[in-house]
From Swiss-Prot:
Keyword NADP: no
Region (Disordered): 103-126
Annotated family: Belongs to the bacterial ribosomal protein bS6 family.
Name of the protein in its database record: Small ribosomal subunit protein bS6
One MF annotation (Gene Ontology) recorded for this entry: structural constituent of ribosome
Regions crossing the membrane: none
Classification via InterPro entries: Ribosomal_bS6, Ribosomal_bS6_CS, Ribosomal_bS6_sf, Ribosomal_S6_plastid/chlpt, Transl_elong_EF1B/ribsomal_bS6
Record PANTHER family: MITOCHONDRIAL 28S RIBOSOMAL PROTEIN S6, SMALL RIBOSOMAL SUBUNIT PROTEIN BS6M
Gene that encodes the chain: rpsF
GO biological process, one term: translation
Amino acid sequence: MRHYEIVFMVHPDQSEQVPGMIERYTASVKEAGGQVHRLEDWGRRQLAYPINKLHKAHYVLMNVEAPQNVIDELETNFRYNDAVLRSLVLHTKAAVTEASPMLKAKDERKAPEALVEEVEAEDADE
């Protein structure tokens, strides 16, 4: 089986449907004997340029190992699902399991807030 990196962007008004979509897509990969190596929900992010007069979208990244027929099925689902604004499926040479730069940047932004909370907690204890 081949390895793929899949990114899809969902309409911001349909963000509550994203967990269900992720569940369906991962289930179809696993049913075919594939494996999900990495799954990241990046949340709502600003678009570089407007798509259908929208300036934000909900991003999801998946790294999967699956047969070609499953990937074709996923691409068809993306194409006919009105909530999916854009999708990209790339063939990769190996499975990628480490956190993506987007997720690392998100964690780094949260880290200073956590440090401030720790300092405030220490000050409260004294």
